Amino acid sequence: MLRAIMSTWTLFFGLLLISAGSGLQVVLLGTRAAEAGFNNIATGIVMSGYFAGIFVGSIVVPQILASVGHVRVFGAMSAIASAAVLVHVVFLDPSGWTAMRFASGFSFAGMYIVCESWLNEKATNETRGQLLSLYMITNLGGMAAGQ
């Protein structure tokens, strides 16, 4: 088990940082939307864009992953997520924010798929459950830390 963790520690560290950023983004966007005067329905639509992106990303990203590989998909999805966060600062509009939340959800779906498939490749039948439980602890712990 220790060997499997040592070969994937960078993946876990990256996941921890990404999850913390995601948790922070949820809190800050909701607060900033209220401060900007978005009504509750607009704020709800903005925040639900993330889950629409997760849904579409979970369907589309595996096809992209099969054609270009783990590293390229992870890099592209990280870049999309980073750009989406920055666009929130530039535009103070619910429709633009909804599109960026969709992009964030899409890219996070991609990063989660890459992480999970990488872990499944590295795991043996004996270590798979332990690695995936560490993955979930890291993911949810990072989100909690970000909030």
Where would I find each of the regions flagged by the language model?
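Helix-to-loop junctions at the C-terminal end of transmembrane segments
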Residues: 57-69
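Core transmembrane helices of Major Facilitator Superfamily
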Residues: 22, 103-115
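Intracellular juxtamembrane helix-capping segments at the cytosolic ends
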Residues: 29, 110-123
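Structural signature of the two symmetry-related core transmembrane helices
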Residues: 72-86
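Helix-breaking motifs and short loop linkers at transmembrane-helix boundaries and internal kinks
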Residues: 69, 90-93
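Residue-level signature of mid-helix packing/kink "hotspots" within the transmembrane helices
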Residues: 51-59, 143-144
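Paired small-residue
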Residues: 95-103
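Helix-loop boundary and gating motifs at the non-cytosolic
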Residues: 6-51
